[in-house]
Amino acid sequence: MAVAVTAVLFLAVVIAPQWTETKKPPRPSDTSDTSGTSGRDRRTMCPLSIPGIVQNCYATLNAFPSKECCKDLKTASKREVTCLCNNVIAHPDPLYTNTNQVNKACGVLDKYACDAGNSNGGATKKIVASMGLFGVVASLFF
């Protein structure tokens, strides 16, 4: 009986925060393509609007970016930052694995955080993880 109660409490503790967590609406792709094509086509067109940044900064596989790269990253518009976040940084290609190192070296890590609108800084996931761990530990003792 105690095992069943512990199992139910464990599931309630782990699952409940996921039910009460607010969900963000899906973000539309921010692209330069206004021809009315499908979202998938527009997402693939977005990197074409910023080839210089991708080529000079992320495609080099070098953690030490050039001055030109840093200048481009620092002067990028909000539209370009959103495009890079949605297509290169958030969904990295194996060729672009150095995005965080390049952004950090150029001093623009905060600008390219890609989820700056989330003000809790991942606290929800930490709470869920700690509650799940508590449930596992509690189930060992009861």
UniProtKB/Swiss-Prot annotation:
Key word Glycoprotein present: yes
Keywords: Cell membrane, Disulfide bond, Glycoprotein, GPI-anchor, Lipoprotein, Membrane, Signal
Disulphides: 46-85, 57-69, 70-106, 83-114
InterPro entries: Bifun_inhib/LTP/seed_sf, Bifunc_inhib/LTP/seed_store
Lipid-linked residues (GPI-anchor amidated asparagine): 120
Biased composition (Low complexity): 29-38
CC terms in the record's Gene Ontology section: plasma membrane; side of membrane
Signal peptide: 1-22
Source taxon at top rank: Eukaryota
Subcellular location: Cell membrane
Propeptide segment residues: 121-142
Membrane topology (UniProt): Lipid-anchor; GPI-anchor
Region of interest (Disordered), residue spans: 21-43
Keyword Nucleotide-binding set for record: no
Main location per the UniProt record: membrane
Stated role: Probable lipid transfer protein.
UniProt family annotation: Belongs to the plant LTP family.
Name of the protein in question: Non-specific lipid transfer protein GPI-anchored 34
Organism (species): Arabidopsis thaliana (Mouse-ear cress)
